[in-house]
Amino acid sequence: MKNKLLQLVEQNQIRKDLPNFNTGDNVKVHLRIKEENKERIQIFEGLVIAKDGPGKGLSQSFKVRKISSGIGVEKDFPLNSPIISAIEVIRRNKVRRKKLYYIRNKSGKSARLKEKK
């Protein structure tokens, strides 16, 4: 159990501008990339295969997977990171599990998920 003072400090730090999304959703994560004196936005689009629960507070994170040139790429993002400028939910899929690690072993049509109605 967390200290009340720690909870109070965390409440001020948690970002409220990001949309609500779940495991199984297709998302676009807009990242701020700094290169020397320039700053640009890079978009990482893929399927959310894992997400920590809201009980984690500031340390909440999520994992996004995409296929790039036939190779699976996964990135782990801290949800409250200042590097993330925006998150767009593209499609909500119907899933029955909290962690979709089994998708790593699937390819092609077997890796598809049904869209929520």
Swiss-Prot record:
PROSITE patterns with a match to the protein in the record: RIBOSOMAL_L19
A GO biological-process term: translation
InterPro entries per record: Ribosomal_bL19, Ribosomal_bL19_CS, Ribosomal_bL19_sf, Translation_prot_SH3-like_sf
Keywords associated with the record: Ribonucleoprotein, Ribosomal protein
Keyword Ribosomal protein included in the entry's annotation: yes
Molecular function per GO: structural constituent of ribosome
Ribonucleoprotein as UniProt keyword: yes
Gene Ontology CC: cytosolic large ribosomal subunit
Sequence similarity: Belongs to the bacterial ribosomal protein bL19 family.
Protein task: This protein is located at the 30S-50S ribosomal subunit interface and may play a role in the structure and function of the aminoacyl-tRNA binding site.
UniProt protein name: Large ribosomal subunit protein bL19
Gene source species: Mycoplasmopsis pulmonis (strain UAB CTIP)
Gene that this polypeptide is encoded by: rplS
